[in-house]
Amino acid sequence: MVSFKSLLLAASAFTAVLGRPFDSFDGPDVNITDADELLVRRQVTANSEGTHNGYFYSWWSDGGGQVTYTMGAGSRYSVTWKDTGNFVGGKGWNPGTGRTINYGGSFSPQGNGYLAVYGWTRNPLIEYYVVESYGTYNPGSGGQLKGTVTTDGGTYNVYVSTRTNQPSIDGTRTFQQYWSVRTSKRVGGAVTMQNHFNAWAQFGMNLGAHYYQIVATEGNGDFVGTEIWGLARGCRR
């Protein structure tokens, strides 16, 4: 849940992610108009979390603009938005672990948005991101650069930042954010979470008791977003 820098964006700017869900990467594409694929559709309504088709989901929005979160079969989800405040949502697991997450798809943002493995811990209260791709703003750049970690065929810059009196899983709190931001953006491949956790610990960035961990889309901006799909393949739970 990050406040982005203000950007002037063309009215035609858009974001798109297309792909297949975590658990059926090699299966046929699903027609998103099928009624059985569109279980939950929200347009800036109540924030929520729970379980859907065997996966944990979380959805949070600050209530601004127009944003719709749709959950489909298995791990499939989509987000569309226009003129929004901040939102973050996706599907994954509860609790988070050092699992290896394999994913694929396409992601071509032209504004404030990114695709990441996203989660929380308690005691200490930590919000964390492993950012695989992002649009016009590097979401970790407002924090303190701690170093780098090389894993899964790439290098990630590691940042830490502090959020003061901001929304969290435990209400309004002050907490730290941990970031690993891939230097060469990609959509597709493995994310070995344990390697990031180990690197963070070496930089004195300790985690607490894990809450959820999801493949998430986060966005903010005065532009139109088209359909977005988070996906993965062959996940080790």
UniProtKB/Swiss-Prot annotation:
GO terms for biological process: xylan catabolic process. Its EC number is 3.2.1.8. It catalyses: Endohydrolysis of (1->4)-beta-D-xylosidic linkages in xylans. The active site is at E127 (nucleophile), E218 (proton donor). SUPFAM superfamilies: Concanavalin A-like lectins/glucanases (SSF49899). Pfam families: Glyco_hydro_11. It is an enzyme of class 3 (hydrolase). Coiled coil: none annotated. The keyword Membrane does not apply. Endo-1,4-beta-xylanase involved in the hydrolysis of xylan, a major structural heterogeneous polysaccharide found in plant biomass representing the second most abundant polysaccharide in the biosphere, after cellulose. May act as an elicitor of plant defense responses in certain plants but does not exhibit any cell death when transiently expressed in N.benthamiana. This is Ethylene-inducing xylanase 2. It comes from Verticillium dahliae (strain VdLs.17 / ATCC MYA-4575 / FGSC 10137) (Verticillium wilt). The gene is EIX2.
